[in-house]
């Protein structure tokens, strides 16, 4: 009997303890399980990100843009709610905000970190990236972290992941030291490397490629880590409607081509990097473009003036006296026939050339079938600007004959090189064309346009908010690393 009483007492105590322990967890689980409902009730999806040239930025027209913004906006539309963006300084700030329910999703080209598996949920991977050690071109290129000396200035942004990587290396290499600057973004540190203010930083490979388009002095020494999946982070929960909704959205985005279109918009141009070309171009942005900016703005019409400027650079490198062996002339490199059609008499007059080039490009846009999405018509028009309207229509026909969608720019552009292959052009109305050149032509213009946008964005940001000094940072040495 005594044993039974003891067992009952113990069982009762355990039951009370279990109730006491489980009840708050039930509240937490209930709260987490209702995270999706909370978003629906408030009518807003709150996404945390980082302001840079890939994830999120305000474009020259004052509109939000960036890969993570476009993807987040599409997901918010899928949920039937508004999107609220919270821009934070670094990944640690994002994870802290997510942990404290200040944001619903963290999205900033974040690499997969297994150690966060219990704290957060992972969304589907949509690309991959690695951590890279970056230095200034022209200086000695280190081959490994062991080649960094105590006098080298390695500065990183606030990142627990990077701190763990470097701390592990420091155990094998006691002389390794670095600074953590919580005031500067990853992009800002990359710019400081380019300007020679610091020796090295470590950055996400996606952000490195983007920064190189405006600061070609940025060079990659080596990858610190292997490539890892990039995905969104969500609040942790034993059951999550939000994660299920995101999975369904991402599956649909892959099937309908949304992911491919967003990646093409923000990634295709940064995949190409030619130091000499980009260096010459950024010099031209500084020294030559200001001479013609007013004219590009005056005659931009329905176009972004930066796109018109990019076309002119691709055509003539902003040389109003340019002449080719085939007879095209001027800053927009117009043929005599096009000049006559646009009713100008001096192709080497910059204003006449820019005006005619813009009007001709607008006319080409009007010739693109209305079945093509409005935002993609410009790429078809640029293809026609380069190789002729007939060949542009030919590549649409070819795409359809190969089972593709002629209204999908991604499918059409990959078929452009086929216009130079006899088995294909022999069956087309307008015959042979250097389609591979047209492909590169459009890619270059997109890259040049984005470089102008980001060059001015960085410049304006530095003017309005001068970079904090590198000395405003925490120095990590072997001694305080072990404390």
From Swiss-Prot:
BP terms from Gene Ontology: cell wall macromolecule catabolic process; cell wall organization; peptidoglycan catabolic process
Lipid bilayer topology: Peripheral membrane protein
Predominant subcellular localization, coarse grouping: membrane
Chain spans, region LT domain: 272-483
Keyword tags: Cell outer membrane, Cell wall biogenesis/degradation, Lyase, Membrane, Signal
Transmembrane segments: none
Cystine bridges: none
Name of the protein in its database record: Membrane-bound lytic murein transglycosylase F
Species per Swiss-Prot/TrEMBL record: Actinobacillus succinogenes (strain ATCC 55618 / DSM 22257 / CCUG 43843 / 130Z)
